[in-house]
Amino acid sequence: MSELTGEWKEVLSGEFKKPYYRSLYEFVKEEYSTHTVFPPADKIFEALHLTPLSKIKVVILGQDPYHTPGQAQGLAFSLPDDAPTQPSMRNILKELKDDLGIERTSQNLTNWAKQGVLLLNTSLTVEEGQPNGMADMWLPFTTRLIENLSKQDQTIIFVLWGKQAQKFAEFIDEKQPIISSA
């Protein structure tokens, strides 16, 4: 797993010392050495690398990375432009067009991340063909991350897409707006 720097390292450094995180780290390391896991190991924290904490305006929370080769990029819902369009991306593109009149052709959402949209999954890794298979291991870390985000001074809009993401509403401070949809 790649190292976090700056604001993220400061906010999460305490978590990295906790027993649950050591177990998570060892589990993920073992999974990468014995199975096909997505995204690539150097992209696990890509959402945090691309979106500085102080710049976050919106958190879009999904379930887990795409679980087939050549798709997961470390950003929830984002796909390489040459990848087959997945149902979730098809819905995003449709809603952009229908609701906002935006005709977006790129499936790569990196530009959103750089503009303050944290594209985060509740599980940051997934074994090939095993959707939500690593969710329990990631739950403590993702919970603490969401709690920390929701306690920031700035207003952050939390968009919870899917049943797994909606379970995280209870960890979001009441001062932060939540948009919850299936």
What are these regions (language model features)?
Residues 5-10:
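Short, contiguous pre-domain boundary segments
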